Amino acid sequence: MIDKIKLSVNELFSGVGMQRKGIENTGLFDVEVKCTSDIDINAIISYAALHCGLTKEMVDTYSDYPTREEMANDLSVRNIGFDFKTNKSYNWNKLIKSGNRLLNKVWLAVKLGDNLGDISKIERLPYTDLWTVSFPCQSISVAGKLEGLAEGSETRSSLLWQQIHLLRVSINMGEAPKYIMFENVKNLVSKKFKPDFDKLLDTLSELGYNSYWEVLNAKFCGIPQNRERVFCISIRKDIDTGKMTFPKPFDNGLRLKDMLDDKVDEKFYINNARADKLIEELIENGTLPKACASRGRDTNDNRGAMATTN
């Protein structure tokens, strides 16, 4: 039996905790997450359910809730539920008198996940060995508006630089993490955004980190999905051995047909007519570029190959 290495982690832009899950799946580490940071309500609830044991029964039977006014204030201070489309914060106060259990559920999920909320409102992070940083991709993804991630641009992807601010704070306090793992879409290293990525690497170097990056495709990592992502591992220079390497690509033969059921309940299907209508509505509303339109429609049986995700 392998003695697991203790690894403390801060998960920034934590989502549902897949960074943590990936580390745990290696079987090499005893992971302790000190804090998370996310503002998406569904992601926060999912994180707590997947990693912290949150259940409906727990929400109903938990006996140490503060007052509803205090819960609403706590979530508001953390900016939980902020809507980027309308640029408005969620009004938690409207749930105080209604008795709506969503207030209890989200507050408890935040507590269980040690969620600090909006990264732009965090003053400092607890010391950990590793920070994981899956910053928002909406402003650099080919499925988005390509607004960029330049520092000070106030795009969603530029929230990356708030993490750099927090890193400076930690360094000044003598609490620099040993490692930082960045992950984002392949377009991060495209001609359009490579200068910003290079600026990130230069900044990390100035702050005392050596950075190693690679574009990895899930289909060469044992997953039947054609999904390319940039991974960047930054290691503190005083502990870097120079031996960092990325895994060699491999194909274990697993295909999409091996993962899908042949008989699926009709309620899970959207027929082509409905899919076409949905795509038209999304394009008209400006939430789906025309270039993405062909992805949502079932045009052929591709189960023997790989699922494609941009």
Residue ranges and their predicted role:
Residues 1-33, 44, 79, 87, ...:
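S-adenosyl-L-methionine-dependent DNA methyltransferase catalytic core
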Residues 157-236:
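Conserved Class I SAM-dependent methyltransferase catalytic core
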Residues 60-66, 180-189, 281-297:
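A broadly tuned preference for mixed-charge, low-complexity surface segments
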Residues 140, 223, 246:
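Short clusters of hydrophobic/aromatic residues that line enzyme substrate/ligand-binding pockets
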Residues 42, 65-69, 161-166, 173, ...:
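Short C-terminal domain-edge/linker segments immediately following a structured domain
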Residues 2-177, 186-191, 195-197:
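Core alpha/beta nucleotide-donor-binding catalytic domains of modification enzymes
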